[in-house]
Amino acid sequence: MDIKTALSRIVGHLDLSTAEMSDVMREIMTGQCTDAQIGAFMMAMRMKSESIDEIVGAVSVMRELADKVELKTLDGVVDVVGTGGDGANIFNVSTASSFVVAAAGCTVAKHGNRAVSGKSGSADLLEAAGIYLNLTPVQVARCIDNVGIGFMFAQSHHGAMKHAAGPRKDLGLRTLFNMLGPLTNPAGVKHQVVGVFSQALCRPLAEVLQRMGSKHVLVVHSKDGLDEFSLAAPTFVAELKNDQITEYWVEPEDLGMKSQSLHGLAVESPAASLELIRDALGRRKTENGQKAAEMIVLNAGAALYAADHAYSLKEGVALAHDALHTGLAREKLEELGAFTAVFKMENEG
């Protein structure tokens, strides 16, 4: 099916099949569509609302066209990732949590990009920390093997997305493409914590990942609007485990944490986010640093559970607390910077 035929269907509020959506996405991502067609398609899909079949079709093509990272095993390898777009502008919780997860002895294949709507995307933060981003898939795999954590810069692995970049920027609205990043990890991880910008997306995206072969995933959105677990409000979870999806709410107190406001955790730049994270992963000299540490522990604990490194969310949080307080997470951050510096010299001379 071509994009013109698809548009006429979607405008009539008819869903596309998985195969039809795959045809259209392949057409878009191989440069066969005009910007006007892509923009119209994205808006029509948004107005109709994307079906699970359509998201699966889009994800399948993005995964097919990605520059993949080949790992020795995917057992227990986890990604902590969010769609962004929650408007909260708090520090990079998922990225900071990834280093705690690695410090706890779990392997992390982190996928991320620059900020779209917020002040600091994961790539912006890591660049501020001196971590070299423009790695080949083989170099990313070496980071993961040697450091226990590696970062896959989305634009380096999903080059075909460039064809939709102009229309996405011109529209300036959330579209199907905002959902695709967390669902298209180039290493093909089967364990994830996926934060989303709307509770309504939790169950559908869990179903998409179920169909794509994921093993243990938590798709989350907090009642105060975050695309991650919150210290300040209950968090809604759609959990995929043993090929079953269950939905539930989690309070911080359920996991041995104390509820508290997020005041002081918003940042205006990657540098400010990095400063807060370094304090949280280090000696926690400030009140905000201590609060940030607890937010990191909460989300790292969820990742350890999703990776099957812990038997429950509560045990995951306890393991994350211990890992953060050893100081190893901050060491992992510095270690990744040093390791990627070698690749920078190799790649740039």
UniProtKB/Swiss-Prot annotation:
GO process terms (BP): L-tryptophan biosynthetic process
EC numbers: 2.4.2.18
Annotated metabolic or biological route of this protein: Amino-acid biosynthesis; L-tryptophan biosynthesis; L-tryptophan from chorismate: step 2/5
Sites where the protein binds anthranilate 2: R168
Binding residues annotated for anthranilate 1, in chain numbering: G82, N113
Cofactor annotation: Mg(2+)
Main function: Catalyzes the transfer of the phosphoribosyl group of 5-phosphorylribose-1-pyrophosphate (PRPP) to anthranilate to yield N-(5'-phosphoribosyl)-anthranilate (PRA).
Name of the molecule in the record: Anthranilate phosphoribosyltransferase
UniProt source species: Pseudomonas fluorescens (strain SBW25)
Lineage: Bacteria, Pseudomonadati, Pseudomonadota, Gammaproteobacteria, Pseudomonadales
